């Protein structure tokens, strides 16, 4: 901020950080400085599906396709990889998927919708990734869901999972 001011340039408008149901370090590290009361820098989150872990396709009850990233690439995003992730990470991902199912949403829709409702997110914007056109369409469909689709009851359930499985990516 100071450098931009010293150079007579506009200040940063957004910051890109990994942010998801499983990775919330922004909330404790940067949310206050980025808030509208301070520097008003919105978060533009990436890795909202944690490399696909929050898509539901790696649940114990699911059978991931051979072309799925974590199947095809053993070392891809190791902290989220089902073969390498901590048990608490997999437990949280499975519990979030169950919340989505009870609400009639896909796990990916829940993960994206949750990010969109966070106060720090820049204009509800979220960076999504996909391997297939079908995945891209599912991710885009999540942006058509009204924010009210995430009910207070669902938020309470999400918060309860978070309290039991607090930021599992921070303890690698």
Where are each of the predicted segments found?
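Glycine/proline-rich, positively charged
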Residues: 1-29
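Conserved short secondary-structure transition element at the edge of the structured enzyme core
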Residues: 7, 48-49, 82-146
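Glycine-rich, positively charged active-site loop/lid region within alpha/beta enzyme cores that binds
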Residues: 33-99, 121, 168-172
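Short, hinge-like loop/turn segments at secondary-structure boundaries
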Residues: 3-8, 31-34, 60-64, 143-146
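Short, well-structured alpha-helical segments that form the helix of a local strand-helix-strand
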Residues: 107-114, 151-161
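Structural preference for beta-strand elements that scaffold enzyme active sites
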Residues: 11-16, 40-44, 125-127
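Glycine-rich beta-alpha junction loops
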Residues: 18-25, 47-58, 114, 131-132
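Short helix-capping segments at alpha-helix termini
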Residues: 4-12, 38-39, 104, 147-150
């Amino acid at each position: 901020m100071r450098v931009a001011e010293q150079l007579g340039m506009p200040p940063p408008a957004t910051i890109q950080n990994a942010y998801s149901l499983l990775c919330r370090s922004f909330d404790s590290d940067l949310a206050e400085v980025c808030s509208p009361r301070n520097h008003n820098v919105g978060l533009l989150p990436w890795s909202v599906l944690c490399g696909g872990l929050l898509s539901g396709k790696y649940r114990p009850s699911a059978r991931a396709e051979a072309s799925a990233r974590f199947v095809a690439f053993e070392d891809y995003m190791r902290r989220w990889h089902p073969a390498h992730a901590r048990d608490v990470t997999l437990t949280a991902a499975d519990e979030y998927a169950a919340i989505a199912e009870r609400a009639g949403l896909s796990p990916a829709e829940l993960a994206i919708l949750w990010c969109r409702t966070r106060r720090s997110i820049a204009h509800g914007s979220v960076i999504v990734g996909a391997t297939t056109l079908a995945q891209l369409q599912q991710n885009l469909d999540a942006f058509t869901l009204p924010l009210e689709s995430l009910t207070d009851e669902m938020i309470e359930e999400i918060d309860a999972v978070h309290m039991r499985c607090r930021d599992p990516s921070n303890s690698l």
